[in-house]
Swiss-Prot record:
The keyword Cell cycle does not apply. Belongs to the mTERF family. Gene3D superfamilies: Transcription termination factor 3, mitochondrial. One of its GO terms (cellular component) is mitochondrion. It comes from Mus musculus (Mouse). This is Transcription termination factor 1a, mitochondrial.
């Protein structure tokens, strides 16, 4: 009897459980059906809202004078951001003295600027002002290189870089030059800047410099861009100078602390290619290996000239009956453009000045000095 009662209880429980499950499943099914249109409606509203925001963004940017096509090419992802701060950025830059035209140009070339918050911008600006003398100086840098300021919003990294560069003995004047000429230095990771400074210190010591910090200051002051290059590139260029000109440690040290510092950040391929062209061109004009090396060492800026520019200038001078030996003795004349060279050669010829037998140094003089000389020649 007890067994029968237990069986009845179990059967009733199972039937009740089945009824409850059927009822619950139906409710879930009906709820899922009833919620689907609502969910689709929400998605549609969100999409419409996002599209409206993007239309609003485009409208704002056009009003601000932004070149939309340029901005899309450079950083298209910015236009998909749900939140942007273009109006806040405009007000911030206006308060610092930037014109509407400059602001439009900045955003056109670096659209990501509109994703920075006012708080981050203000903090970063204050850090830059510790180096620069005025807001206008910073605005000028942003106009030339907006990426340098807006590329990173890691203000702690910027602050640490400033402290580190001060700690290695860079003067306020040197920091100002860095921020003006190579602002990306301050967006580098702190470790990257440390690696380059340590490399330069070790290089100075290996060449016999008794003050590694002073060596670093000299190199950076002469070539502010060096900190945004790789240690491999700088090392390869130093090795190139040493092997090409057969320099001992003392002479190499003097060279890279002086005029050689400027070419340390050049592309290694560019350095070798340009030097090879200079050498081959001058040898073809009858110059000796010694004359070629003396010519380049006396004015290392020659290495910056591309193959075409160098050859065109040499051809221009040779056509005007100026000898290779005269060019070797006056390398700075190659700083002048071809148009300047041709104009001055023509004017001097009309004034009765014989460049084939007289000094050609005046071809590289400043315009003011040259005009004074020409006036005297013309009587």
């Amino acid at each position: 009897m007890a067994s029968r009662n237990i069986w009845c209880v179990r059967r009733n429980f199972l039937f009740d459980l089945r009824d409850w499950m059927l009822q619950y499943s139906a409710e879930v099914f009906l709820k899922s059906i009833s919620f689907r249109p609502f969910s689709a409606e929400c998605d549609s509203k969100d999409k419409e809202s996002l599209e409206e925001e993007r239309e609003d963004l485009l409208s704002n940017l056009v009003t601000m004078g932004v070149d939309i096509d340029m901005a899309r090419r450079r950083q298209p992802g910015v236009f998909n951001k749900a939140v942007t701060n273009e109006q806040e950025l405009k007000l911030f830059l206006l308060s610092k003295g930037a014109s509407d035209k400059v602001i439009g140009s900045i955003i056109s070339r670096y659209p990501r600027a509109i994703t920075r918050t006012p708080e981050s911008l203000s903090k970063r600006w204050d850090l830059w002002r510790k180096i620069m003398a005025s807001d206008l100086e910073i605005v000028n840098i942003l106009e030339r290189s907006p990426e340098s300021f807006f590329r990173s919003n890691n203000n702690l990294n910027l602050e640490n870089n400033i402290k580190f560069l001060c700690s290695v003995g860079l003067t306020h004047k040197c920091l100002c030059r860095l921020l003006t000429n190579a602002p990306r230095t301050f967006s580098n990771s702190l470790n990257l800047n440390k690696q380059m400074v340590e490399f330069l210190q070790e290089t100075g010591m290996s060449l016999g410099h008794n003050d590694p910090r002073d060596f670093v200051r000299k190199i950076i002051s002469k070539n502010p861009s060096i900190l945004i290059q790789s240690t491999k590139r700088v090392k390869t260029n130093i090795e190139f100078l040493q092997s090409t000109f057969n320099l001992n440690k003392r002479d190499l040290l003097l060279l890279i602390c002086g005029p050689g510092a400027r070419i340390l950040d050049l592309s290694n391929d560019c350095t070798k290619k340009n030097y090879t062209n200079i050498r081959e061109r001058l040898l073809s004009l009858g110059c000796s290996e010694e004359e070629v090396q003396r010519f380049v060492l006396s004015y290392l800026n020659m290495v910056f000239l591309s193959e075409k520019k160098f050859n065109d200038k040499i051809d221009c001078l040779i056509e005007e009956k100026i000898s290779a030996s005269q060019i070797i003795e006056n390398p700075r004349i190659l700083d002048s453009s071809i148009n300047t060279l041709k104009t001055r050669i023509r004017e001097l010829s009309h004034a009765g000045y014989d460049l084939s037998t007289s000094s050609i140094a005046l071809l590289s003089w400043s315009q003011r000095r040259y005009e004074a000389k020409l006036k005297r020649l013309c009587g």
